[in-house]
UniProtKB/Swiss-Prot annotation:
It is a multi-pass membrane protein. It comes from the Eukaryota. The lineage of its organism: Eukaryota, Fungi, Dikarya, Ascomycota, Taphrinomycotina. The gene is nca2. Belongs to the NCA2 family. This is Nuclear control of ATPase protein 2. One of its GO terms (biological process) is mitochondrial mRNA processing. InterPro entries: NCA2. Its main location: mitochondrion. The chain crosses the membrane at residues 447-467, 513-533. It comes from Schizosaccharomyces pombe (strain 972 / ATCC 24843) (Fission yeast). Involved in the mitochondrial expression of subunits 6 and 8 of the F0-F1 ATP synthase. GO terms for cellular component: mitochondrial outer membrane; mitochondrion.
Length: 573
């Protein structure tokens, strides 16, 4: 997301205002037809080229007010396209600069870089040595350090004696000189791009067109047209100066626009120069991995050939283990969750009691108590009331008889009801246990979905960790992780704050500092797209980033915007 897009639309609106003020928008005119093609703020190069070609035809006739508005809008489009190109190239330079700076963090990275670049260095040694022998018949430069380290300057090489060439210290020192030199030159080229970025962004956000639009209503047609012509000429000349064009006096403004658009289809000269200082190619960086992989494959082939039977059994065992894991711990639990959702609780697989067990035992207890009361109590007792009391757990009649029989336990055990009352209480105990189990059973059935979900959670977590590891380390080597994006965001925010702090005394930014600030802000906007922010938080963050980029209110306001990001988004970045 380009944070300057809104300001660009304001520029277009001011050009439209200039056109509307003088009423030169006749629908039948060819000029107005060309003007209508510039309504979009996102034209392709092909569309813009067609418009410029038509403007060249208009340049041969009388130049009315709308003609200069068309030129202004074309130049504004080219400002955007040039700014996009410079930001993209600066981003690539910054990525390569970050690579060289990461090598300087530890000795392991330097040694690894030396190993990765060894084939290229060997190629330079062979080529330069053969050239030296064939042309000069000089054998003394075969092992010269300049052949092994072609990017290190001569003064750096002379700092080390020849007999220390093969020592580890001198090699690491030369490596350090090389990658620091690459980083230094990339930083210089990026700063040159930053100057152009600052100039373009300041022009897009300037009020020059707005002032011309506001003053055109107070002037006559000739004076207002002269003001607009001056603004448009400045915009077009700025494009040619930033591209380093050599303009002939015979070339018209549409010709300059055409040349500018044609140059935008090719990388800039600074980018071509920066390619010599880019990080090594993917093949050069990964050839140790490829070599180790091929060697491992060859050794594995030898081992497989010698131990074919045992390896086959091992593979079969791993395959069956993976299949069983998927079937028993992923597929079946997931299907069980769906069955739990669709099934009735009465059909639940989690149960402690059979469905009719408690009911039958309760009915048996009621019959035993009613029979006992009928046999031992006088007539006239309400048996339905006794049945209800038994269902509620009240065995008063049985317990009274039991207490009476305990007075003469031996006699009542032989000829009384002691044994009968004991058996009734035993049945009561069984019913009480089943009632408790029934309560636990209902609780388990109510939480069956929770148990099923908890049961499958470890398997899903295990699969998620494996898939994420494979995705992060095998398939997405060139994609920044979320943690890396947040780190790059914090680094860019720190760099933006340093730029503003250094310019705090002057309360303004020069073109290079402002361009670096714009670059860092756009980098933060790109990094924030995949940091896991919600839509509302992302919109608020982009507004604050736009406040950092805007220089309308001074450096202090920009620093407050940086502090606001630190304060409000510290948990998100």
């Amino acid at each position: 997301m380009e944070l300057y897009q809104k300001h660009l639309k304001d520029v277009y609106a001011n050009f439209n205002k200039l056109a509307a003020v003088h009423g030169e928008t006749t629908s039948n005119s060819v000029t107005f037809h060309v003007f209508q093609q510039l309504d979009s703020t996102n034209l392709t190069n092909y569309q813009l080229e067609n418009v410029i070609t038509q403007v060249k035809e208009l340049d041969k006739g009388p130049k009315d007010y709308l003609y200069w508005v068309i030129l202004g809008r074309c130049s504004a489009h080219l400002h955007v396209k040039m700014l996009d190109q410079l930001l993209e190239e600066a981003m690539i330079m910054s990525d390569n600069l970050h690579y060289w700076e990461s090598i300087d963090k530890n000795w392991y990275s330097r040694v690894l870089f030396l190993i990765q670049s060894f084939p290229t260095r060997l190629y330079h040694i062979c080529r330069n040595s053969i050239k030296s022998i064939l042309q000069f018949q000089n054998f003394s430069n075969i092992f010269a350090k300049k052949n092994l380290f072609p990017k290190v300057s001569k003064s750096d090489v002379l700092l080390f004696p020849r007999d220390a060439f093969i020592s580890q210290a001198s090699l690491l020192s030369l490596i350090r000189h090389e990658y620091r030199g690459n980083a230094k030159r990339l930083r210089q080229l990026r700063d040159e791009h930053a100057c152009k970025i600052g100039c373009l962004t300041r022009a897009i956000m300037s009020e020059g067109v707005s002032d011309a639009a506001s003053s055109s209503g107070d002037k006559n047609g000739i004076s207002a047209k002269a003001d607009l012509k001056q603004v448009v000429s400045q915009w077009i000349q700025r494009l040619s100066q930033l591209q380093g064009q050599k303009i002939d006096n015979s070339e018209s403004l549409p010709d300059i626009l055409s040349i500018t658009l044609d140059n935008l289809s090719h990388p800039t000269d600074e980018y071509f120069e920066a390619k010599a200082y880019f990080r090594p190619s993917a093949i050069e960086r990964n050839w140790p991995k490829i070599f180790v992989t091929l060697l491992s494959a060859w050794l594995s082939t030898q081992i497989i050939t010698k131990n074919r039977t045992s390896i086959r059994l091992w593979i079969d065992y791993l395959y069956s283990t993976a299949v069983d894991f998927y079937t028993n711990w992923i597929q079946k639990p997931i299907l069980g969750i769906f069955d739990t959702i669709r099934s009735n609780r009465a059909d639940s697989q989690i149960t402690l009691l059979q469905t009719k067990s408690l009911e039958s035992d309760m009915e048996s207890l009621q019959r035993m108590v009613i029979d006992f009361v009928s046999d031992t109590s006088p007539a006239g007792i309400n048996l339905d009331l006794v049945k209800q009391e038994v269902q509620q757990g009240d065995l008063t009649y049985v317990l009274q008889a039991y207490e009476h029989d305990l007075k003469t336990p031996i006699r009542t055990a032989v000829s009384g009801n002691l044994v009968r009352t004991l058996l009734i209480q035993l049945q009561k105990t069984k019913v009480d246990v089943e009632v408790a189990l029934s309560g636990i059973d209902r609780l388990l059935k109510s939480q069956e979905l929770v148990f099923a979900t908890v049961g499958i959670t470890p398997s899903l977590i295990f699969c998620y960790v494996i898939i994420r590891y494979v995705k992060a380390n095998i398939f997405n080597n060139d994609t920044l992780s979320r943690a890396e994006r947040r780190q790059r965001f914090r680094q860019s925010l720190r760099a933006a704050e340093r730029i503003l702090v250094r310019s705090q005394k002057m309360n303004s930014l020069d073109d290079m500092s402002y361009g670096l600030l714009v670059f860092q802000v756009n980098l933060m906007a790109i990094m924030s797209m995949d940091m896991g922010l919600s839509k509302d938080v992302a919109e608020d963050l982009l507004q604050d980033l736009e406040d950092i980029q805007s220089s309308s209110y001074g450096v202090q306001a920009q620093l407050r915007a940086v502090d606001r990001i630190y304060r409000l988004f510290k948990n998100s970045i």
